[in-house]
A protein has these predicted regions:
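Hydrophobic alpha-helical segments at protein termini of multi-pass membrane proteins
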Residues: 1-209
Length: 209
């Protein structure tokens, strides 16, 4: 049995100490890191509860329950940030990526502790794939929120649309992972390639301008 709340405390403790030492400018970064790990912890409990309540098998829990719960939980700190502080677009994107990155880091650490770290090649691909998938979802949500929340009429519909898009992407990723074999490695490679392609296109556009 993995006591993920103990892992959470061990990982968050140095972040809290660093946040106190770094000053107000960097405080936001550490708070979003802690929020990302916190929602990952809560997502694990909610996933387990819903899977037990719905009597879902492993595939249903992975492809149907987990993507919805995890993406909704990752959105909550961002919505709170938007409602309370009304930040600028660049700050929204940075917050979304930080939450997603912290979520992926905590998830990977828990996976390593539960399943072991003896298979380097598999862990390598999983680490990059899962991290890139969560960061890609963060990029989509962050960029989308920065656009939609500047327009009052688009806030609710835009947020729901972005949530639906990242849930679908997350579900496809989890389905490919659950299928196993070559599909599993395609799933690990796909988000990395999408992030790389996105960065390359942005670089080319900036050079043309």
């Amino acid at each position: 049995m993995t006591y993920i709340e103990n892992i959470f405390l061990c990982m968050v403790s140095p972040l809290l100490v660093a946040a106190l030492c770094m000053g107000r400018r960097q405080l936001r970064l550490f708070l979003f890191c802690i929020a990302g790990m916190g929602v990952c912890l809560l997502s694990a409990y909610i996933n387990t509860f819903l899977a037990a309540m719905c009597q879902a098998d492993a595939l249903a829990a992975t492809a149907e329950i987990a993507p919805v719960v995890e993406e909704m939980m990752k959105l909550l700190p961002l919505v709170f940030y938007l409602l309370v502080f009304e930040p600028e677009g660049d700050k929204i994107k940075a917050a979304a990526i930080t939450v997603a990155l912290a979520f992926a880091t905590f998830e990977n650490v828990c996976y390593l502790i539960q399943n072991g770290a003896d298979r380097f090649s598999f862990i390598f691909f999983r680490g990059f794939g899962t991290g890139a998938m969560h960061v890609l979802c963060g990029l989509i949500v962050g960029g989308g929120l920065a656009y939609t929340w500047r327009r009052t009429w688009l806030k609710v519909a835009g947020t729901c649309g972005l949530l639906g898009a990242v849930i679908t992407l997350h579900a496809i990723y989890n389905l490919l992972i659950a299928y196993g074999g070559a599909a599993q490695y395609i799933a690990y490679a796909l988000p990395v390639l999408l992030v790389a392609a996105g960065r390359l296109s942005i670089f080319r556009l900036s050079r043309k301008q």
